[in-house]
Curated annotation (Swiss-Prot):
GO terms for cellular component: host cell plasma membrane; membrane; viral envelope; virion membrane. This is Envelope glycoprotein gp160. GO terms for biological process: symbiont entry into host cell; virion attachment to host cell. It comes from Maedi visna virus (strain 1514 / clone LV1-1KS1). SUPFAM superfamilies: Virus ectodomain (SSF58069).
Length: 989
């Protein structure tokens, strides 16, 4: 027996559930299927379709006004779809025509692109560049094994700009370093060629001229090109910024390059294909080399403040720490020592990755004097460093087999008979054909320099590192709170190398110059207590201190054997430098190795020149990144500027006329599209509103149907229960009847019960009766009544809910309007479409503009014809004089009195032509002109009366006032050409 609940349940116990229960999705699918079947059955009926939902009127008032059946509804539906399709096709055609006209009007700029199709911006990044095939392109392709220049597109004409967002998405503001194998392969070919021809050099003389000289000297220039499916991404704008600042030492672990503008090309710029080691390069390479002088990004860096860091930030290309110049696969090209100056590992070779970041830039030799850097004369005698920089390559340099001076104006060239290719030296037994004795002032030169402390983001100034005994405790000389990442948080009042205990707990060595300028800060996480314990453990340093003694600029400690502790070559702590006799090692404090045994005196190293063609190409190729594309097409559109300039005024006028016509057509198209868009918007809004109401009504109808389904299920359960109770009642009545019957039989048989058995003297067949114990577990009449009451309550509640849902469904169904009523209810279309009444005026205006345009065209044609008819062209006539020529000059007869004898004969005035004479002359000119023999006869013949009137007005004035003038006109017979009389003498037009 179940307990009564607040929410009605569909059944009272599990055994009373119906045998099949359908889900809500199945019910909806069944409803949709039935609705579709009804629509298919009723499509062919003339009476039309009825409503697909059923409304139940609980109030007993059925709707009397049934909608009339629209027999044209199927036709209207298909007709509307056809109209919409036609409008869409018309709109697409109009847009296509518009785009075609716009494309036709725009002229190409002789600039074609490479169409890249891939992810995310048309390309994929290639990280392993050694697997990319490459070829060279040059003019002398048959001699050097390259392809001709036309084999690949010119990158200056055919490229594609890559957006900044795509660059940031692909490269994450990190333009990486790539060790390209292409220059290494060329260097390998040169080495192989030199080894194969080494025996032949001994037989050659200085007069022998080899074509290989052009290649060795770098005169053979070409491009590197990659085939499909690869391309090159050439950077156009870039800058550098620091990354991963070490909080202990303050140096930047990485210097990243952010490329903000790039182009996709197929070939690189022109560069020397091969060359030996040299100092200066040709002026053709100056722009490419200058591009590698990368500036710092416009972010908050200390080096950008000229007041804090004189000279600004570093400019150049940073070869990252850990880069391999010559990979392991081509280790035979390394040689014993690096010939590239600062481009070397910690052992001075190229076997290991770089341990220090190396900067390469085009040198600025403007401040050099006699081949030496600025302030070189102020250095200590014999020293190779000045202003914190140790210079290599000052003096004698190796250039294309010659020893030259670092002073370009001296012109020293001593041929050594040796050529350096990479790390190997090859003999060259005859003098090359090139000349190096010229003044190479103004030629671009590579400069390789290293910041050993790697604090380029803080300052570009190089310093002389402090020795470990030239320090003092900064008591009272350092004020403020500064750190390795914040040099501006403190001030110094005295020059020196001050050992300072920072607020973070570590030790700092603050380098102060000029009593107030902080030029560097070196730090470590080791605190003062730990350092002092190490210091006290040094031999004979128990009573010593690090206080400053002496009056020098830097000062020193009292005992040189008790300087700042460091780790010796055995990695043990010591406070004294190693000695050998009277000589003592100079040990310095380094920013990245505070406790190490550092012997580098200067924080910077610089090298001038010394790069061969391999490194030259390697540096220029860092501007490019290899990408992989799915497909690209080349196309060259040659539209020279002279082609456009050669067009005459005729073509320009026709083009302007076409543009005006296109403008009028575009206005008409836009007006039509606006009308179509307005109609489409209205129908779309109406459809949306009607769909919204329909969706609500259908949802309510579904809810009502669900409630009715629950009522039916509950009724079915109640009927089952009643039927079961009736069967039980029948069984009980039958049992009572049988019991009474048997009792009567027992009485008649005179039997008695003994242990549930009937003992009688009658036969056993008569006394064998049915056992009725199986009915003992049946429910009682009281339980049955309780279940019936629960069913009645459940059924009544479900009926009330079903009635409410049906009422809501009726209300929502009545709210479903037709399309136009939905539009009127959603928007105030009376004001929205008030402009529709002006459509006839708009159409009239457009038609008027078209008519006005046609009229203007006709008038322009008439004016052109009028100008041609008005301007009378005279024919050239050759006059043959048959009368004899009088050689003697006769006395002139001057009738105007200039000779003293005036003529008394009245002067004959030329009378003005009458209107009839002008008409005859004009008509005769018209008949003999070519205008009357074409289709333009009728438009032009209407101009003849106006032309005659105009000529008559020119001769007689606007109202004939020229005839009434009595003033004698002056006639200049020499300067004025008289017009022949048209009534007698006619000229040919």
């Amino acid at each position: 027996m179940t307990s009564k609940e607040s929410k009605p349940s569909r059944t009272t116990w599990r055994g009373m559930e119906p045998p099949l229960r359908e889900t809500w999705n199945q019910v909806l699918q069944e409803l949709v299927k039935r609705q579709q079947q009804e629509e298919e059955e009723q499509q062919g009926l003339v009476s039309g379709k009825k409503k697909s939902w059923v409304s139940i009127d609980l109030l007993g008032t059925e709707g009397k006004d049934i909608k009339k059946v629209n027999i044209w509804e199927p036709c209207e539906k298909w007709f509307a779809q056809v109209i919409w399709g036609v409008l869409w096709v018309l709109q697409i055609v109009l847009w296509g025509c518009l785009m075609w006209e716009m494309r036709k009007g725009n002229q190409c700029q002789a600039e074609e692109v490479i169409a890249l199709v891939s992810d995310p911006g048309g390309f994929q990044r290639v990280q392993h560049v050694e697997t990319v095939p490459v070829t060279c392109v040059t003019k002398n392709f048959t001699q050097w094994g390259c392809q001709p220049e036309g084999a690949y597109p010119d990158p200056e004409l055919e490229y594609r700009n890559i957006s900044r967002e795509i660059l940031e998405e692909v490269y994450k503001q990190d333009w990486p370093w790539n060790t390209y194998h292409w220059p290494l392969w060329q260097m390998e070919n040169m080495r192989q060629w030199m080894k194969e021809n080494e025996k032949e050099y001994k037989e050659r003389t200085n007069k022998t001229k080899e074509d290989i000289d052009d290649l060795v000297a770098g005169r053979i220039r070409g491009r590197f090109c990659v085939p499909y499916p690869y391309a090159l991404l050439r950077c156009e704008e870039w800058c550098w910024y620091p990354e991963s600042i070490n909080q202990e030492t303050g140096h930047a672990e990485k210097i990243k390059i952010n490329c903000t503008k790039a182009k996709a090309v197929s070939c690189t710029e022109k560069m020397p294909l091969a060359a030996v080691q040299r100092v200066y390069w040709e002026k053709e390479d100056e722009e490419s080399m200058k591009f590698l002088n990368i500036k710092a990004c416009n972010i908050s860096l200390r080096c950008q403040d000229e007041g804090k860091s004189p000279g600004g930030c570093v400019q150049g290309y940073p070869i990252p720490k850990g880069a391999e110049i010559i990979p392991e696969a081509m280790k035979y090209l390394r040689g014993k020592k690096s010939r590239y100056g600062g481009i070397k590992d910690k052992n001075g070779e190229l076997k290991l990755p770089l341990s220090v970041r190396v900067w390469v830039r085009m040198a600025n030799l403007s401040g050099w004097v006699n081949g030496t850097p600025p302030y070189w004369s102020a250095r200590v005698n014999g020293s190779t460093g000045i202003n914190g920089t140790r210079w290599y390559g000052v003096g004698t340099l190796h250039h294309l087999g010659y020893n030259i001076s670092s002073n370009p104006e001296r012109g020293i060239c001593d041929f050594t008979g040796e050529l350096w290719i990479g790390g190997d030296k090859f003999p060259y037994y005859y003098k090359p054909s090139w000349n190096c004795s010229q003044n190479w002032t103004g030629h671009p030169v590579w400069q390789v320099f290293r910041y050993l402390d790697m604090t380029e983001h803080m300052t570009s100034r190089c310093i002389q590192r402090p020795e470990r005994h030239n320090i003092t405790v900064g008591n009272g000389t350092i004020t403020g709170n500064c750190s390795v990442t914040n040099w501006d948080g403190c001030n110094c009042t005295r020059s020196g190398n001050h050992l300072y205990n920072s607020t973070s707990g570590g030790l700092l060595v603050i380098i102060c110059r000029q009593n107030s300028t902080i030029t560097g800060i070196m730090g470590t996480n080791t605190n003062w207590t730990t350092m002092w314990n190490i210091y006290q453990n040094c031999s004979k340093c128990n009573n010593s201190s690090l206080d400053r003694t002496g009056n020098g600029t830097l000062g020193t400690v009292n005992d040189l054997k008790c300087s700042l502790p460091h780790r010796n070559e055995s990695n043990k702590w010591t406070c004294a430098a190693r000695r050998k006799g009277s000589r003592r090692d100079s040990l310095y404090i380094a920013g990245r190795d505070f406790w190490g045994r550092v012997k580098a005196k200067y924080s910077c190293e610089s090298n001038l020149g010394g790069l061969d063609s391999m490194m030259h190409q390697q540096m220029l190729l860092q501007r490019y990144q290899v990408i992989r594309v799915r497909a690209y097409t080349y196309g060259v559109v040659e539209m020279p500027q002279s082609y456009m300039e050669a067009q005459g005024e005729n073509r320009r006028s026709r083009r302007n006329l076409q543009r005006k016509k296109r403008g009028i057509g575009l206005v008409i198209v836009l007006a039509i599209m606006a009308i179509i868009a307005a109609a489409g918007a209205g129908l779309g809004v109406a459809n949306a509103v009607q769909q919204s109401y329909t969706r609500t009504a259908v949802q309510s109808l579904a809810n009502a149907t669900a409630a009715q389904q629950e009522v039916l299920e509950a009724s079915y359960a109640m009927v089952q229960h009643i039927a079961k109770g009736i069967r039980i009642l029948e069984a009980r009545v039958a049992r009572v009847e049988a019991l009474v019957d048997r009792m009567m039989v027992y009485h008649e048989l005179d039997c008695w019960h003994y242990q549930h058995y009937c003992v009688t003297s009658t036969r056993s067949e008569v006394a064998n009766y049915v056992n009725w114990t199986r009915f003992k577990d049946n429910c009682t009449w009281q339980q049955w009544e309780e279940e019936i009451e629960q069913h009645e309550g459940n059924l009544s509640l479900l009926l009330r809910e079903a009635a409410l849902q049906v009422h809501i469904a009726q209300r929502d169904a009545r709210r479903i309007p037709d399309a136009w009523k939905a539009i009127q209810e959603a928007f105030n279309w009376s004001s929205w479409f008030s402009w529709l009444k002006y459509i006839p005026w708009i159409i009239m205006g457009i038609v008027g503009l078209i008519c006005f345009r046609i009229l203007m065209c006709v008038i322009s044609m008439c004016l052109q014809a009028y100008k041609q008819v008005k301007q009378i062209r005279y024919t050239q006539v050759t006059v043959v004089i048959e009368a004899p020529v009088e050689l003697e000059e006769k006395q002139k007869r001057n009738g105007d009195g200039t000779n003293g004898c005036a003529s008394l004969e009245r002067e004959r005035r030329t009378s003005h032509r009458s209107f009839i004479q002008i008409w005859r002359a004009t008509w005769w000119a018209w008949k003999t002109s070519p205008w009357r023999h074409s289709w333009r006869t009728m438009p032009y013949i209407t101009l003849l009366p106006m032309l005659v009137i105009w000529q008559w007005m020119e001769e007689n004035g606007w109202n004939g006032e020229n005839q009434h003038k009595k003033k004698k006109e002056r006639v200049d017979c020499q300067d004025r050409e008289q017009m022949p009389t048209l009534e007698n003498d006619y000229v040919e037009l």
